[in-house]
Design a protein with these regions (language model features):
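Two-component/phosphorelay signaling modules centered on CheY-like receiver
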Residues: 14-32, 119
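Conserved sequence signature across two-component system core domains
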Residues: 10-11, 34, 52
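A Lys-centered signature of the CheY-like receiver
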Residues: 105
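Active-site beta3 strand of CheY-like receiver
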Residues: 47-53
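Receiver (REC) domain active-site loop signature in two-component systems and cognate sites
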Residues: 58
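Alpha4 helix (beta4-alpha4-beta5 surface) of REC/receiver domains from two-component response regulators
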Residues: 65, 86-101, 113
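Acidic catalytic/metal-coordinating carboxylates
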Residues: 36-39, 62-65
Length: 123
């Protein structure tokens, strides 16, 4: 039996977190939530998730800044970036910084399953 993955969802939209939580729990994951990048960094350190779904545009600390800090303290953790306003430049920037993948919102169930499979390969 496969290990139950612990996934951190970070998005300022409570509705999106709720939707993504339901999707991931339906796929057998344990889910932790954060509503901004600062909280994501703290929860990464405290909870030790297996992977992170991280929105790019958030108040206080955005996803790109959070990714930089997370990479400094946890360089191996798989991070999937999420954005509704992603440009090719942002996509390339996050991938160069070590993001595993990038999903454009609104996402499909198939994209989440694929991202989860990518995370599973890394843990």
């Amino acid at each position: 039996m496969e290990k139950k993955l612990k996934i951190l969802i970070t998005d300022d939209s409570q509705l999106l977190r709720k939707k993504l939580r339901a999707e991931l729990e339906g796929l057998g994951c344990e889910v932790i939530e954060a509503e901004n990048g600062k909280e994501a960094v703290m929860k990464d350190l405290q909870e030790k998730p297996d992977g992170i779904f991280l929105d790019i545009v958030m108040p206080e600390v955005g996803g790109i800044e959070a990714l930089q800090v997370i990479r400094e303290v946890n360089p191996e953790i798989p991070v999937i970036m999420l954005s509704s306003a992603g440009t090719p430049q942002k996509l390339m920037e996050t991938l160069k910084m070590g993001a595993l993948d990038f999903i454009q919102k609104p996402y499909t169930s198939e994209q989440i399953k694929k991202a989860l499979a990518s995370i599973r390969k890394k843990v």
